[in-house]
């Protein structure tokens, strides 16, 4: 992963990707996974997202992994939580508080147990194409048999704008999750007033997927 790029974003507080409230896609489409309270949830590249709080209100165990130590510490500090911190290695820390378990370090090496449910809003689209296959292989290994993924992707002409966030078109989604049941829940096409279209993109769409193991 491009560690330095994201570390600099958090260090300089250039975090336009961070939403100050729960993502409406999560609240609208989480029920499509038919989630149960005792099912475990994994959120890759979670940042300090408010989505974690929403999920913890509905599940007993929410696990995240985030490269930036700044983001992980901010998540707990902003909520006045005092987590138990375990140093797992020189580059990996484990933060635990009530329903929350968050690893601070590399997604590819964090020892995360397979979960029933996965929520990926900003992880896959944060990675360049050459990293997405390896990322997805790891993600699939962290999903239990019968598990479900709620995935959010973007679709635009990558030649017209440099990521991140990157474009992950339908054909790539279907290739990455080949062998799994893939259902597109939504495709939201940007209109002429959308900031991305005003900046010159010929098209820009947000897509929501239900992926079942």
From Swiss-Prot:
Record's catalysed reaction(s): S-adenosyl-L-methionine + a thiopurine = S-adenosyl-L-homocysteine + a thiopurine S-methylether
Gene Ontology molecular-function annotations: thiopurine S-methyltransferase activity
Domain of life: Bacteria
Gene3D superfamilies reported for this sequence: Vaccinia Virus protein VP39 (3.40.50.150)
Enzyme Commission numbers on file: 2.1.1.67
Keywords in alphabetical order: Cytoplasm, Methyltransferase, S-adenosyl-L-methionine, Transferase
Protein name per UniProt: Thiopurine S-methyltransferase
The species this protein was found in: Aliivibrio fischeri (strain MJ11)
Chain's gene name: tpm
């Amino acid at each position: 992963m491009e560690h330095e790029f994201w570390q600099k974003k958090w260090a300089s507080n250039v975090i336009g990707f961070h939403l100050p409230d729960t993502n409406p896609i999560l609240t609208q489409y989480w029920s499509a996974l038919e989630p149960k309270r005792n099912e475990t949830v994994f959120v890759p590249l979670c940042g300090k997202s408010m989505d974690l709080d929403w999920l913890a209100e509905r599940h007993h165990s929410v696990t995240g992994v985030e490269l930036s130590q700044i983001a992980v510490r901010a998540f707990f500090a902003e909520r006045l939580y005092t987590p138990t911190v375990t140093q797992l290695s020189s580059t990996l820390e484990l933060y635990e508080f009530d329903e929350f378990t968050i690893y601070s370090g590399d997604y590819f090496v964090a020892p995360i147990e397979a979960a029933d449910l996965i929520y990926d809003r900003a992880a896959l689209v944060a990675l360049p194409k050459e990293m997405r296959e390896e990322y997805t292989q790891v993600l699939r290994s962290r999903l239990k048999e019968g598990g479900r993924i709620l995935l959010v992707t973007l679709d635009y002409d990558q030649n017209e704008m440099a990521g991140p966030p990157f474009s992950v078109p339908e054909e790539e989604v279907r290739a990455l999750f080949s062998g799994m049941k893939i259902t597109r829940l939504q495709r939201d096409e940007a209109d002429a007033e959308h900031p991305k279209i005003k900046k010159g993109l010929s098209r820009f769409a947000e897509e929501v997927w239900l992926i079942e193991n």
